[in-house]
Amino acid sequence: MNYRIDFAVLSEHPQFCRFGLTLHNLSDQDLKAWSLHFTIDRYIQPDSISHSQIHQVGSFCSLTPEQDVINSNSHFYCEFSIKTAPFPFHYYTDGIKAAFVQINDVEPRVRHDVIVTPIALASPYRERSEIPATDAATLSLLPKPNHIERLDGEFALTAGSQISLQSSCAETAATWLKQELTHLYQWQPHDIGSADIVLRTNPTLDEGAYLLSVDRKPIRLEASSHIGFVHASATLLQLVRPDGDNLLVPHIVIKDAPRFKYRGMMLDCARHFHPLERVKRLINQLAHYKFNTFHWHLTDDEGWRIEIKSLPQLTDIGAWRGVDEVLEPQYSLLTEKHGGFYTQEEIREVIAYAAERGITVIPEIDIPGHSRAAIKALPEWLFDEDDQSQYRSIQYYNDNVLSPALPGTYRFLDCVLEEVAALFPSHFIHIGADEVPDGVWVNSPKCQALMAEEGYTDAKELQGHLLRYAEKKLKSLGKRMVGWEEAQHGDKVSKDTVIYSWLSEQAALNCARQGFDVILQPGQFTYLDIAQDYAPEEPGVDWAGVTPLERAYRYEPLVEVPEHDPLRKRILGIQCALWCELVNNQDRMDYMIYPRLTALAGSGLDTKIPA
């Protein structure tokens, strides 16, 4: 490439840090009539920049220099300030993600990708921490079952072995077991032969519980429900050891039951679009570790990923980002058109795929904040042209909140929620409700008129007005609304709404004390976009510190709540999450998820003793 950016921390102060940016012209031609465009996950103070002007939308920054010529083999330099308190720059991923130079005096405008060198950090480097040595386990089972009785000997599955069904609810689990035995071990059970694996009903077991017995023969998987058989199959798959043409399984008795009814994983597909097969791959892994819920984050400021047949603009416009698109580039892939969406037929495929593995799919449609993709796609319904309110969201947008005073907002909600409710069998529909910035709606004549009509005294009460409409709508469709922690701030929603609490476990318990049912999702332990170490090359964010494998494993939910405290009944379960601002490919996804996912799986299934 002919251009390169060097980016460095010049000075660190308690609130703001000063940065230097150098754009090198490495070509043999002068660079004229240029502008620089790049992404960074921090907000640049617009009045702090030298020798240029800057405009920022989300993570996408456009820099216009005072002198728009860089001679061949010369450079441009500027400085600017970023608020870094309380989160200083620790990682290379804190720096500039991607960049391009645009030539503005020709049509069509020409764009050149720019090499971005790793940020020169001012803070002392931390060496990558070593994972503590551990003793090898005699049995590799994750999560650890409640009861294990190891017996002498092993059972051999041979070329003549087959799977026998003695339960009407075991068929789909048996199909999955066959598929995974073939995929993982290249072993194909026969339709005719010895019934060496038997799945049979045990009505004494609760939903999700199972009994697995291996002695002389046959291998017995017992459960009272489809998901119980899936869990039993997942355990059997971990016990198997290849031995030539056979598979050996240790003689053992395992009794297991989930600790929480809800054991979930959230995947953000809005910040970066993840292809269907990547989504299904994750769901299959969740089944192996006995999760039973896949929370699908389908909409956000950066993209709308679900087909709504009555509103095709949402995916025609809102599913795509790029320099020549309505939505600007964000995070990565700046000079490419990035995005995509899932058709309703593809979503049905995912729902069926997950159901075969005992997993319920919960969709999330994030409102009233995080709605920029929808607003840009449907401005005739969702844009309030008279609103002069000044605000900036936590991701640096000033136009990402739905207006509770526009009739189009309610038409939009009706269309979307009706199609979503018809598409997803899940009783829960996630409505977001998080991170509505201060300052919204205060200078909108329409919103002020609505406040006067309803007797509201604070503009934030309008969020409750909108959420209660969504809650009532979902209830009429036979669904229960769930939302992030902010949904319960103030008198916004009824106690029928389930709260996903992400700030801390103590915050979750406070929600439960108010009478809400709660899903535990403390970011300090369960957010998989959190970096795993303070080494600068480690990808991730650190607003909640770092979460190495050991910390994820040692997380013990509700350890300070007495066993018989009725508050425990309000805790429906636990969930981990992967936000994907920094995740745009399979390798990065795997790195962020594993092995911490396997450690957190135990928090939903077994009771660990904290160190």
From Swiss-Prot:
GO terms for cellular component: membrane; periplasmic space. Keywords: Carbohydrate metabolism, Chitin degradation, Glycosidase, Hydrolase, Periplasm, Polysaccharide degradation. Induction: By (GlcNAc)2. It comes from the Bacteria. It is found in: Periplasm. Its main location: periplasm. It holds the Pfam family Glyco_hydro_20b. Pathway: Glycan degradation; chitin degradation. Inhibited by mercuric ions, PNP-beta-Glc, PNP-beta-Gal, PNP-alpha-GlcNAc, and PNP-beta-S-GlcNAc. InterPro entries: Beta_hexosaminidase_sua/sub (IPR025705), Glyco_hydro_20_cat (IPR015883), Glycoside_hydrolase_SF (IPR017853), Hex-like_dom2 (IPR029018), HEX_bac_N (IPR015882). GO terms for biological process: chitin catabolic process; glycosaminoglycan metabolic process; polysaccharide catabolic process. Optimum pH is 7.0 with (Glc-NAc)n (n=3-6) as substrate and 5.8 with (GlcNAc)2 as substrate. The keyword Hydrolase applies. Its EC number is 3.2.1.52. It catalyses: Hydrolysis of terminal non-reducing N-acetyl-D-hexosamine residues in N-acetyl-beta-D-hexosaminides. Optimum temperature is 35-40 degrees Celsius. The keyword Hydrolase applies. Belongs to the glycosyl hydrolase 20 family. Hydrolyzes aryl-N-acetyl-beta-D-glucosaminide (aryl-beta-GlcNAc), aryl-beta-GalNAc and chitin oligosaccharides. Can hydrolyze rapidly the artificial substrates p-nitrophenyl-N-acetyl-beta-D-glucosaminide (PNP-beta-GlcNAc) and 4-methylumbelliferyl-beta-GlcNAc, and is slightly active on p-nitrophenyl-beta-GalNAc. This enzyme is not processive, i.e. when it hydrolyzes (GlcNAc)n, both products, (Glc-NAc)n-1 and the terminal GlcNAc, are released before the enzyme attacks a second molecule of (GlcNAc)n or (GlcNAc)n-1. Homodimer. This is Beta-hexosaminidase. It comes from Vibrio furnissii.
